[in-house]
């Protein structure tokens, strides 16, 4: 499981995907979410504005699981 550190209280899923190097630009988030299976704490998610908090587990198909950690 890869750790993705954040400095704020939460991060939006679209921003997270860019930070985790799943996408190269924020503009790709919408289409990426439509085409890729993503779960947040075990539940399917496709909203790029979904807030991710410390200790959330995000599983991105083709990239593996990530853990959000506030640093």
Q: How should these model regions be labeled?
A:
Residues 12-54:
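A basic, amphipathic helix-loop patch mediating RNA/tRNA/ribosome contacts
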């Amino acid at each position: 499981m890869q750790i993705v550190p954040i400095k704020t209280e939460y991060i939006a899923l679209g921003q997270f995907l860019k930070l985790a190097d799943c996408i190269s630009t924020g503009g790709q988030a919408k289409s990426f979410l439509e085409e890729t299976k993503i779960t947040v704490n075990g539940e399917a998610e496709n909203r790029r504005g979904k807030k991710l908090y410390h200790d959330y587990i995000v599983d991105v198909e083709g990239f593996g699981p990530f853990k959000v950690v506030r640093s």
